[in-house]
Swiss-Prot record:
The keyword Repeat applies. Residues 89-279 are annotated as: Serine protease. It comes from Chaetomium globosum (strain ATCC 6205 / CBS 148.51 / DSM 1962 / NBRC 6347 / NRRL 1970) (Soil fungus). This is Pro-apoptotic serine protease NMA111. Residues 1-48 are annotated as: Disordered.
Length: 1030
């Protein structure tokens, strides 16, 4: 990729926020901590989001607890007031179902309170309602539950209004808390009644200490501005967002919004003047007009204003008109190309608006909201000079996105005023709110602005849509983009546009009448353009004295694998590596299974760094960590060389030549020596089982290059490949939360039987023993009961390694053999079909035999058994179901390797953030045994039961954890954003898989009309996009 991407570190164009009382602070709504503990390494269907707004919730709460103020018993007046208030306070459980603007996809809980019991309006924070799709419900004090949906979210200020059906509350009277912003005074005692720290009801006391602080800053997410906030000491924490701040008479005088995270008990409240106006507009059926001039003002005290140019004459007038005021409004940010551009400047002191002296945000909001589309006159002081300007007031709603388009796995909307204000840029451009699918850029998951697509400028969303309509499926196009943190750098990349896994270009538009976002299909994909043959030449390997070794450059190809759906616990959505061409005439390439883990994927093969062709999976080895893929050789006019694989085992101490490709794809080479050949044990991942190599010999070499390269070969002087150098996926490091990868060699003789069958057009049908072996030395073998005669035979059979193999783990098979006729943990295998087993490659005999004559030692007794092998062709996943944002499929091979009993054939493999599965805690590695009391032993039964469940209704899942702990989860179905979908492997389909959608009681072949990007999608890492081939 040309250009460089911007760093991850948080930095805006604004000055760094001060580490003082006016710094940015976390908002008080609680994310579901119980489903993503710090040590969790199970895959979700989107990127790991460590708490919201950069704060880890549990740490945040622990830091806040010591700061809770001790309070004595409430007076009778307060007790009576609280009893009236709590009836109107609700706990809000909600999902923001996809990333949008400043908000990531998440599940959380917060607080709200009823402000109109007749119409069913609830006031809460805007960062709870969010700017994008919302799905949630409210729980009242008597534990009655009712659905709620947004009818208004303010473009700037931190409040939103939800609507519920008042008739649904049957067992308690619901009143409305009166909003009285006029009663907020310094020194009054208040109570914050809400869902503090995720508890059902908490009542925190405090005293309002300030009415004139600037809005708190929360970092790169949503932040309020152009308003003052109140300050008090109440020690509220996660979950208290949206709580009413009430006085002793039971009036709501403010709205809880945020607080400090450093242990101080300071909290910040939003004044209720603007929420009260919005509520009245809704009650009267009037539009809620919001005006703005794209200039952020802040409150600054008189001493600072003097330094900015406030003259003594104007200060005297202001102090006389407003004796209690100590601050004035000063321009902080003026957005380029906005109404205030070139008229107001940063540092201007605001004196008058339309001839009226003005020092408060509330009055400024009044004027702007009533002047949308009209000019206002501002008198400013700039360095002591009076400047009078006329500025046209814009419509805030028009620069607040209310729609997004999903195409090629990504989602896009117009750049919002929130983002533009944060970074001080013009409020225009195409913003990537969900960087998934084809549009997953490097180094950061959000904050991108698309500049051009396919050499066409995309200044706005409408133009972007038209450009994308004209791009064919599977096209490779040049895209330029910038990051909001670094607009100086223009990044350029080439994207492979995927319109076959996700065929529809969906436009989602906010509907404030229903609270849902309505989906429309804008365009079906244009068919792929037929590829044409292309010509290319390979580079030449310099500084090597062996021409045959140098020629191997022509046997390497670059392989990229993109997986639109997370299956089998695999942690990534895209991988790349170098593959070795083993048959240029047939286009066969061998590559690590750490790069191509399963066949629901898009593979591109790049030859000679020039020719790009499609590839497909031909074979996946169940144990030895390699895959064989195929490209169409007719499309390649280049001198590709078929690598010659050695049939002789490489030995320890042998001289060899290492050729590898390092982390940036550059070829490196060195003469070296084989240091060790050993039976490797790749650690199993403790969190979520995923493919790992077992029962395989690994090779190490004496060169530091080997640790830098994930792809390569060991080659003899005559150019014969002695071993492949592969990446082996290991466990997730509990400290760094990164996946360990091991770089090791695999001897080529073990590949030859499989390669020869594929070259003959035969689909390899391997057999295997369902166990995992570990090498033991003779001292251990003697203690296990191996006789001296067998120990002597081992010494003669393998002079380099005196070892035998013991069974350490049995793989659970669906049709278990009788224990007497099967291998058990602790068995030491002496021979198979008369061959003494002293190295792992001796076990390859199992791949071609349905039954083996085994001699083994069990409990110090030598036994002769006939061992049945099992077919290896049913260990790959061939069917999956996406339901309520989770991916279900039969337990894959890695699960059966690590578990001693299968509880059902319905296994939770992954889940999407912001989905019902995430909200209700249905985690990966669970097994589903019953749906609404009906047994679901397999996917067929599971699918039959879940499609019967009506939309937006509760159902019960009986689950079993990986550690055999049964539990029951109740969930609510959501078909609108997370439709039920079935994926079936089908070689007749163009992309090898068929999709069936079950939505609204209908069975749809292919993709349904609704559903958000990421409905089974990419972990940011999760970030996952499960829209699949229709």
């Amino acid at each position: 990729m040309n250009g460089t991407t911007s760093p991850i570190a948080a930095r805006s164009k604004r000055k760094e926020p001060p580490h003082t009382v006016d710094g940015r602070h976390p908002k008080h709504h609680r994310t579901n901590g119980e489903v993503a503990p710090a040590a969790d390494n199970t895959p979700d269907n989107q990127d790991e989001f460590e708490g919201e707004f950069g704060v880890e919730l549990e740490e945040y709460e622990d830091a806040r607890l010591p700061a809770v103020l001790p309070t004595g018993p409430d007076t009778a007046e307060w007790q009576a007031t609280i009893q009236r208030v709590v009836r109107n306070v609700v706990s809000i459980r909600f999902c923001q179902t996809c990333s949008f603007d400043t908000d990531p996809a998440l599940t959380s809980e917060a607080t709200g309170f009823v402000v109109d019991a007749e119409r069913g309006y609830i006031l809460t924070n805007r960062h709870v309602v969010g700017s994008g799709p919302f799905w949630g419900y409210c729980i009242f004090d008597n534990h009655e539950e009712v659905d709620a949906y947004p009818v208004y979210r303010d473009p700037v200020h931190d409040f939103g209004i939800l609507k519920f059906d008042p008739k649904a509350i049957k067992y308690m009277p619901v009143d409305a808390l009166p909003l009285r912003p006029d009663l907020a005074k310094v020194g009054i005692e208040i109570r914050v009644v809400g869902n503090d720290a995720g508890e059902k009801l908490s009542i925190l006391s405090g005293v309002i200490s300030r009415l004139d602080r600037n809005a708190p800053e929360y970092g790169e997410g949503y932040s309020d501005f152009n308003t003052c906030y109140y300050q008090a000491s109440a020690a509220a924490s996660g979950g208290s967002s949206g709580s009413p701040v009430v006085n002793m008479d039971g009036y709501a005088v403010a709205l809880q919004a945020g607080g400090r995270a450093d242990g101080a008990a300071t909290d910040y409240f939003l004044p209720l003047d603007r929420p009260l106006r919005a509520l009245k507009c809704l009650q009267e059926g009037n539009p809620i007009t919001r005006g703005d001039i794209q200039c952020q003002f802040v409150l600054k005290p008189f001493d600072e204003c003097r330094r900015l140019g406030l003259t003594p004459e104007w200060e005297a007038q202001i102090r006389k008109a407003f004796p209690k005021e100590t601050n004035m409004l000063v321009a902080e940010i003026v957005l380029p190309e906005g109404p205030s551009h070139k008229k107001a400047e940063e540092g201007d002191v605001l004196i008058k608006v339309n001839g009226e002296l003005l020092t408060q945000f509330i009055r400024l909001d009044d004027i702007l909201d009533s002047s949308v589309g009209k000019p206002v006159k501002l008198l400013l002081l700039r360095g002591g000079e009076e400047i009078e300007v006329e500025i046209e007031v814009g419509d805030l709603h028009s620069i607040t996105p209310d729609r997004f388009v999903s195409v090629a796995g990504g989602s896009f909307h117009s750049l919002s005023y929130q983002q533009a204000r944060l970074y001080g840029v013009a409020c225009k451009g195409v913003f990537v709110c969900e960087a998934g699918g084809s549009f997953r850029f490097d180094n950061a998951e959000n904050g991108w602005l698309i500049q051009t697509v396919d050499h066409k400028k995309t200044p706005d969303l409408e133009t972007f849509i038209e450009v994308m309509k004209g791009i064919h499926d599977k096209a490779r196009v040049v895209v330029t983009y910038k990051h909001l943190r670094d607009l100086h750098t223009l990044n350029t990349t080439i994207l492979h546009i995927d319109r076959h896994w996700s065929k529809k270009m969906k436009l989602a538009v906010r509907n404030d009448e229903t609270g849902l976002w309505d989906f429309t299909n804008l365009a079906d994909p244009l068919p792929p353009v037929a590829p044409i043959p292309r010509k290319a030449d390979f580079i030449q390997l310099e500084h090597t004295s062996h021409p045959a070794v140098a020629d191997l450059v022509r046997s390497f190809v670059h392989v990229s694998c993109v997986m639109p759906v997370k299956l089998d616990g695999f942690p990534k959505n895209r991988k790349w590596g170098m593959g070795l061409v083993i048959d240029a005439d047939k286009g066969l390439v061998v590559i690590s299974r750490a790069i191509v883990p399963y066949d629901l994927c898009d593979i591109t093969v790049t030859i000679a760094d020039s020719i790009v062709v499609e590839g497909k999976v031909v074979f996946l080895h169940p144990l030895q960590n390699y895959a064989i893929i195929q490209y169409d050789p007719k499309l390649v006019d280049a001198p590709v060389l078929s690598a010659r694989l050695s049939s002789q085992e490489i030995t320890q101490g042998a001289s060899t030549y290492f050729i590898g490709y390092n982390r940036i794809g550059r070829i490196v080479h060195a003469a070296t020596t084989v240091t060790e050949i050993f039976a490797v044990t790749i650690p199993a991942n403790s969190g979520a089982p995923r493919y790992r190599a077992v029962n395989v010999d690994a090779i190490t070499v004496d060169t530091s290059l080997s640790g830098q390269c994930g792809s390569g070969v060991l080659v003899a002087q005559d150019g014969t490949v002695q071993a492949l150098w592969l990446t082996y996926l290991g466990e997730r490091n509990p400290s760094t939360h990164r996946d360990e990868e091991y770089h090791l060699g695999l001897a080529t003789p073990t590949l030859l039987p499989v390669v020869e069958q594929i070259q003959r057009g035969v689909d390899p049908k391997l057999r295997m023993l369902s166990v995992e072996f570990r090498a033991i030395q003779m001292s251990q073998a003697r203690l296990m009961g191996v006789s001296e005669e067998w120990i002597q035979k081992v010494s003669v059979a393998n002079t380099a390694h005196h070892q035998l193999f013991m069974v350490t783990k049995r793989t659970f098979e669906r049709n278990e053999q009788e224990e007497a006729a099967a291998l058990l943990e602790g068995d030491v295998v002496l021979s198979l079909n008369g061959k003494i087993i002293t190295k792992i490659s001796d076990l390859d005999i199992m791949y071609s035999n349905e039954q083996l004559d085994a001699v083994l030692v069990r409990n110090c007794e030598e036994l002769s058994l006939k061992l049945d092998t099992v077919a290896a062709d049913d260990v790959e996943t061939t069917r999956a179901v996406s339901f309520c944002g989770a991916i279900f499929h039969a337990p894959h091979h890695a699960v059966r390797q690590q578990i001693s009993k299968l509880f059902s054939e319905v296994y939770v493999s992954a889940r999407t953030r912001g989905s019902p599965s995430y909200q209700y805690g249905l985690a990966p590695t669970n097994f589903i045994t019953h749906v609404n009391g009906k047994p679901t032993p397999d996917l067929e039964a599971f699918l039959a039961e879940v499609v019967k469940i009506p939309d937006n209704t509760y159902f019960r899942l009986r689950a079993m954890s990986f550690d055999s702990v049964p539990w029951v989860v109740t969930m609510k179905k959501n078909d609108h954003y997370f439709p039920t979908m079935e994926l079936i492997k089908d070689p007749k389909e163009e992309c090898g898989w068929r999709r069936i959608t079950y939505e609204g009681g209908k069975v749809i072949q292919g993709e349904g009309p609704d559903g958000v990007v990421g409905s089974a999608g990419e972990i940011t890492d999760m970030d996952v996009d499960a829209d699949v081939c229709g």
